[in-house]
Curated annotation (Swiss-Prot):
Function, as annotated: Acts as a suppressor of ciliogenesis, specifically, the initiation of ciliogenesis.
UniProt cross-references to PANTHER family, sorted A to Z: OUTER DENSE FIBER OF SPERM TAILS 2, PROTEIN BCAP
Species annotation: Xenopus laevis (African clawed frog)
One term under GO cellular component: centrosome
Principal place of residence: cytoplasm
Record-given protein name: Protein BCAP
Any single GO BP term: negative regulation of cilium assembly
Signal peptide: none
Superkingdom field: Eukaryota
Coiled-coil regions listed in the entry: 83-144, 191-270, 299-375, 487-599
Length: 641
């Protein structure tokens, strides 16, 4: 196996020679006549491009654990060529700088190729079961070369940094300070990347040592597997028999599972049918409940309507009682009118009977005339004319009868209007009677008040007379004081008071006489009103009897209707009880069905779980057998290889 150092050196020499020739010719032909400022700009652009490319390549190297390699002769040549005297920048120096930078690019390419080789060798090591000592030595050599080339690359970068620092310190007028700082930062980043790459290389070395240790262990295990291979052949045959047996058992289990799946599908269909029946029963129950509720509401409404009807009947009975009281007062008048109407009706009925008899006679005559028509047409014509005249006479009589009927109808209308007037008069008389009663009560109260006032007046009169008698006595005893004018004035005043009291007494007596006359008139009116009230009371008693009879009849009807309603309610209650018993029975059946369904579902779920468990067990056994068979196959293949 060739070492990579010789190939890298040859490639680097050829590349540097060709690059030097090409760059020298190009630079001398193109830039000899141009200014130094243009050269510095070109170098700046070229350096930035190179640094960017180096940064990307270093990132790739860090991801793939790459490193660079270069020869020591190349390093010495770079050192000798890069130590320039500190002078002004010339065209030759720029050309040498460009060549050196291109040499570093070539070195980076060679490092990439070396990294790819190292990667391939590491993959081969990882894939191979046995690793030779030559490969291990080759890996260690390549690792040493990588370390050396990384150091050389770092040294080259240091030289370039020193050169660039000297160059940019001399040419600060041409190049901006910002680009220099950017380049320095990029160089620092590259140094950091190199340090990280070194750490990764150390880690990879430790991993390679671990891999070598593992390879040695695998060799030991291979020796042991050769010893075990003989025992595995017998086990392989035995396992093949077991596999065949398990395959037959699996087929049987599959058939059982299929049969169980068919049974489960049938049971599921039965469960669905039972659920449908349950839903149907629930719908029936809800429908029957709604029907019962509706019937109960209808019966309630009927009872409420019946109660309203009863209340209306009571109000109507009360109204009828009042109307009967009014009608009873007008019955006598109505009876007279009715008797007259009956007489006219009887008279009209007699006339109608006579007319019907005449019509029947005329019909008989018409029949006879029809029979005699064949004998004499002329006689028939004369008779027909006579009949027409008689019919006209009868039509006139019918018109008269219609007029009399219309008159009777008008009379009935008048009678009805008179009845209404009589009712109104009766109501007015009732109102007047109530007013008279109120007036009588007021007059009685006034009489009581007047009697009390009269008694008070009499007591006052007695007191005044007693006072007068006492004063007369005083006057008799005190005659000797009459000479005095003051006593005279007092006597005059007392006499005036007495006269005023007498006038008041006379007025009171006159007023009492007037009140007594009014009371007598009012007593007469009261007697008359009492007589009228007694008559009305009798009428009211008769009306009350009639009303009581009507109320009894109404109560009988109400009791009958109540009995009917009670019988209907009892029937409804019986129906409700029967329906409730049916509902209870259906609910019990529903509960039983639910319990059976739950038990069936539980058993079904338990069976499914058992089947799944058995399937999982069989699958795990099959997998273990397959894994063991695979292990045997691999072990046999490794042994025979």
């Amino acid at each position: 196996m060739k070492t990579p150092t010789s190939t890298i050196q040859t490639n680097a020499a050829t590349a540097t020679h060709g690059n030097l020739v090409s760059t020298s010719n190009a630079n001398f032909s193109e830039h000899m006549d141009e200014r130094s400022s243009v050269l510095t700009q070109d170098t700046q652009e070229f350096l930035t491009d190179l640094l960017n490319r180096q940064k990307t390549r270093l990132n790739e190297l860090s991801s793939h654990l790459s490193s660079m390699a270069h020869s020591e002769t190349f390093l010495s040549s770079l050192k000798s060529s890069m130590h320039w005297p500190v002078e002004e920048l010339t065209c030759d120096k720029v050309v040498t700088l460009l060549t050196k930078l291109k040499d570093t690019d070539v070195a980076a390419n060679s490092v990439e190729t070396l990294i790819e080789k190292l990667k391939d060798s590491s993959r081969g090591i990882l894939r191979a079961d046995n690793v030779s000592s030559l490969d291990a030595i080759d890996i260690s050599k390549q690792n040493d070369l990588l370390w050396k080339e990384l150091e050389t690359f770092r040294h080259i970068r240091g030289i370039l940094e020193s050169f660039l620092q000297t160059h940019y310190s001399k040419s600060s007028r041409l190049i901006n300070q910002e680009s220099v700082e950017v380049l320095m930062g990029q160089l620092l980043e590259h140094e950091k990347d190199n340090l990280r790459l070194r750490e990764q290389v150390v880690e990879k070395e430790t991993k390679v040592e671990d891999l070598l240790h593992l390879i040695q262990q695998e060799k030991d295990t291979a020796v042991k597997s050769n010893q075990v291979s003989r025992s595995t052949e017998a086990t392989h045959i035995r396992l093949q028999n077991l596999v065949k047996r398990k395959e037959t058992e699996n087929q049987q289990i599959v058939t059982q599972i299929q049969s169980l799946a068919a049974v489960i599908s049938g049971r599921k269909l039965e469960i669905e049918d039972l659920r449908r029946e349950i839903t149907h029963l629930k719908e029936k129950q809800t429908f029957e409940k709604e029907g019962l509720k509706k019937a109960f509401r209808v019966q309630k409404q009927k009872v409420d309507n019946f109660q309203d009807v009863m209340e209306n009947l009571n109000t109507q009975i009360k109204k009828k009682e009042t109307e009967l009281s009014e009608v009873h007062s007008s019955c006598s008048i109505w009876k007279d009118h009715h008797d007259s109407a009956v007489e006219t009706k009887t008279r009209l009925e007699v006339q109608h009977e006579s007319l019907t008899k005449q019509i029947s006679d005329h019909l008989k005559l018409i029949k006879t005339m029809d029979e005699e028509r064949e004998q004499s047409k002329e006689e028939n014509a004369e008779k027909i004319s006579a009949i027409i005249l008689e019919n006209a006479h009868f039509s006139e009589e019918n018109v008269k009868l219609k007029a009399s009927i219309a008159a009777l109808e008008s009379e009935t209308v008048l009678v009805n209007s008179e009845l209404l007037e009589v009712r109104e008069k009766a109501s007015q008389q009732k109102h007047f009677a109530e007013q008279y009663e109120n007036q009588v009560q007021k007059l009685q109260e006034e009489l009581n008040k007047l009697k009390e006032k009269f008694k008070d007046v009499l007591t006052k009169k007695k007191e005044i007379l007693e006072n007068k008698a006492s004063e007369n006595k005083k006057v008799d005893t005190n005659d000797y004081f009459l000479g005095n004018e003051s006593f005279k004035l007092e006597n005059n005043r007392i006499e005036r008071k007495c006269e005023e009291i007498r006038i008041k007494l006379e007025k009171m007596i006159m007023h009492n006489e007037q009140l007594e006359s009014k009371l007598k008139g009012q007593e007469r009116d009261l007697q008359r009103s009492e007589v009228e009230l007694e008559g009305k009371a009798k009428e009211c008693s008769t009306l009350m009897r009639l009303l009581e009879n009507a109320v009894e009849a109404g109560n009988k009807q109400i009791s009958e209707e109540n009995n009917k309603v009670l019988s209907k309610e009892l029937a409804l209650q019986r129906k409700l009880q029967s329906l409730e018993s049916e509902l209870k029975r259906k609910r019990a059946e529903h509960k039983q069905l639910g319990c059976t369904l739950n038990a069936f579902e539980k058993t079904h779920n338990l069976r499914l779980e058992e089947i799944r468990h058995s399937l999982e067990m069989t699958e795990s056994r099959n997998k273990s057998i397959q894994s063991y068979v695979q292990f045997l196959k691999t072990s046999y293949a490794a042994m025979f290889e």
